[in-house]
């Protein structure tokens, strides 16, 4: 009798885990965005379970441009043109001090540079805690904060995520300085030339939805104004454009315990592809040790060489490019 009961319990647990893990891989192919009036946390979780993009109004909850220096000491900046070069598999960021990075973005006349995957000092702003209370799912295991912004009309590569929830909180200085976003469902993946960069845990496509490639398949194309929050479901491709230099997007991503289990293979490949596996293990297990280490040697990351500029992509008068000149000056000054 005891053996039968024990086997039954094991079966129920296994079935429960299998059902919820499979739900993490569930996708929707309906090309629609849902508009929602926020009421409480449970209601938003039920809506997000439909695996559709959701847009709702929640003003004054995201980071604005003038708050960036208080929560980030350095910026990771990328050149969108790097993603569309032949044979590109990894796009490394330029690491600059916050003031230098903001100066670069403000002088960029080519709409090429944007900042993402930054190290956020969330304790310096109460907004992250407030957003967690309103958006965090049940049994959340890990939270990832980021703030994304760029030069005017710059855009991010076409990408997707595997977190259980990802919210983009849009803010800006004027009512019309939000983001323009283009999305398409997972069923288009075979036509998108997918790239998996496990070193940076970035999954992207070299299809450019802001330069004509969106005509090859149906996409959602809409604008998110300041004061709104967009929920992007896992395995939905998306790329967004900053409509103004003051456009600022607070990204909050949640991984529940089941989501971590479902993506264990991907996280293992991420750890395996790190240049220094031992130090990254220490970062995950004992983050306090990593904080001390990074504070002692901040300049090591600030002196990384800049990516070479492709002469075929820039006109002969490239030496007059204000943004490129500024990068060189900023790096020398550091």
Regions found by a protein language model. Name each.
Residues 1-229, 239-334:
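N-terminal accessory scaffold of Fe(II)-dependent oxygenases
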């Amino acid at each position: 009798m005891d053996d039968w009961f024990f086997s039954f319990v094991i079966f129920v647990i296994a079935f429960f885990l299998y059902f919820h893990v499979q739900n993490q891989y569930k996708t929707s192919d309906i090309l629609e965005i849902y508009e929602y009036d926020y009421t409480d946390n449970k209601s938003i979780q039920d809506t997000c379970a439909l695996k559709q993009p959701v847009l709702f109004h929640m003003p004054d909850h995201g980071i604005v441009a003038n708050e960036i220096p208080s929560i980030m000491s350095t910026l990771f900046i990328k050149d969108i043109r790097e993603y569309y070069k032949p044979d590109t598999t990894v796009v490394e960021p330029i690491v600059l001090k916050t003031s230098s990075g903001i100066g670069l973005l403000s002088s960029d006349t080519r709409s090429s540079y944007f900042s993402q995957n930054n190290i956020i000092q969330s304790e310096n702003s109460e907004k992250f805690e407030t957003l967690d209370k309103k958006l965090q799912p049940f049994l959340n295991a890990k939270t990832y904060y980021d703030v994304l912004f760029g030069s005017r009309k710059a855009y991010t590569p076409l990408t997707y995520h595997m977190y259980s929830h990802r919210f983009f909180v849009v803010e800006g200085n004027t009512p019309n300085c939000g983001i323009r976003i283009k999305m398409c469902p997972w069923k288009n993946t075979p036509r998108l030339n997918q790239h998996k960069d496990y070193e940076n845990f970035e999954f992207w496509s070299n299809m450019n939805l802001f330069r004509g490639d969106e005509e090859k398949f149906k996409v959602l194309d809409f604008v998110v104004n300041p004061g709104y929050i967009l929920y992007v479901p896992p395995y939905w491709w998306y790329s967004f454009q900053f409509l103004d230099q003051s456009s600022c997007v607070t990204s909050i991503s949640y991984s529940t315990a089941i989501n971590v289990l479902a993506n264990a293979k991907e996280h293992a490949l991420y750890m395996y592809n790190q240049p220094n596996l031992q130090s990254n293990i220490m970062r995950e297990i004992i983050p306090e040790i990593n904080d001390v280490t990074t504070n002692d040697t901040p300049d090591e990351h600030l002196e990384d060489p800049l990516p070479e500029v492709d002469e075929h992509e820039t006109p002969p008068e490239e030496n007059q490019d204000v943004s490129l000149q500024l990068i060189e000056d900023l790096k020398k000054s550091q």
